[in-house]
Regions:
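Active-site rim helix/loop that mediates acceptor-substrate recognition in acyltransferases
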Residues: 28-55, 191-217
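A conserved beta-turn-beta hairpin within the catalytic core of GNAT-like acetyltransferases
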Residues: 73-87, 236-246, 297-298
Length: 323
């Protein structure tokens, strides 16, 4: 079996494999879960080659039997500058040895990413995904769980909103980063955004890897009590996708529930469904939304592989001078 970079002549075969996997997923998953996968960087989110991606194919006896695709993080980043890559797709053709092909593709991508100077590879997979062993055996480890909650008709429980609410301002960014560090376990923040600069690069995707919504009306507020203790961003959809709610909140008293109610109030007279992507450590927000008509749509595993260890710059000491 030969692993090589994908070329234009491979596109028809790649699209055929992707459609086949697409059909299987559509038959197995609820429509809303399928839509989430299409709009996020969940494994199976094929990006066109016009975007900045790495794509490699596995070839056996002259026939393409699998492919893998990765992009810079955030999506669209020039790959020459990317130090973090997101695996977007891994497909193996029907009838091929899934373990052998997937393992070889993941190994090749890891080696190529390291040669390009990447520090880490991320991937998100639905739980119980059959391709999970291919990543685990190549050194990927789970660092978080993503929970997507969904409601056909979300309902507020109260019009009592948090004290200190105000619209977000450009100058809030550093305080928002401090809030992110407070609510995120250190093991996660050190992987995803160990510095303010890296957090800013990921902020557009709200730390979920979700593709930016088009044709949506966005509203963003913070809860300011000298320090920021809460943040909510609402994207009211003008198309077929559900409205989107994003949250950060300290797990203090009534704050999660009040922030959830305020977020729902920003949807106005929308009668469509809504969803929100949260992490396992956001259990206070998950519980608050469950009490307002939401239920778990799907659970995804977030995995990472460290390609190169970061070595802190050694501090210069004072050396006595003689003579």
């Amino acid at each position: 079996m030969n692993i090589r970079a994908a070329g234009l002549l491979d596109l028809a075969r790649i699209e055929e494999m992707h459609r086949s996997a697409d059909i299987r997923l559509s038959e197995a998953a609820p429509p809303a879960a399928r839509l989430w996968s299409l709009l996020s960087s969940t494994l199976s989110a094929l990006l066109p080659l016009t975007q900045e991606t790495l794509m490699y194919v596995a070839e056996d006896n002259g026939k393409v039997v699998g492919f893998i695709q990765a992009s810079g993080q955030p999506l669209g980043l020039d790959l020459r500058r990317a130090r973090v890559l997101q695996v977007l797709n891994l497909q193996v053709a029907d009838g091929s040895d899934s373990d052998e092909v997937a393992f070889a593709l993941v190994e090749h991508l890891s080696n190529q990413a390291l040669e390009r100077g990447a520090l880490r590879l991320f991937v998100r997979l639905p739980d119980r995904d059959p391709l999970l062993p291919a990543f685990r055996l190549r050194g990927f480890r789970q660092y978080a769980t993503e929970v997507v909650v969904y409601a056909d008709k979300p309902a507020m429980r109260s019009d009592q909103f948090p004290d200190g609410l105000r619209p977000a301002r450009r100058g809030d960014n550093r305080m928002l980063y401090q809030l992110y560090r407070k609510v995120t376990p250190q093991g996660v923040s050190q992987l995803e955004a160990p510095t303010y600069r890296e957090w800013r690069a990921l902020h557009g995707g709200e730390w979920t890897g979700r593709l930016a919504a088009r044709g949506s009306d966005k509203l963003e507020h913070v809860v300011d009590r000298i320090e920021l203790v809460g943040w909510v961003k609402v994207e009211r959809s003008s198309g077929a996708r559900p409205d989107t709610l994003n949250f950060l909140a300290l797990p203090e008293g009534p704050l999660p529930g009040e922030l959830a109610d305020f977020g729902l109030s920003l949807l106005g007279d929308s009668e469509g469904p809504a969803w929100s992507s949260l992490r396992h450590y956001d259990s206070h927000m998950i519980d608050a939304l469950r009490g307002r008509g939401f239920s778990v749509l799907l659970t995804q595993l977030l995995l990472v592989k460290e390609l190169a260890a970061r070595v802190p710059v050694q501090e210069k000491g004072l050396v006595p001078s003689y003579g």
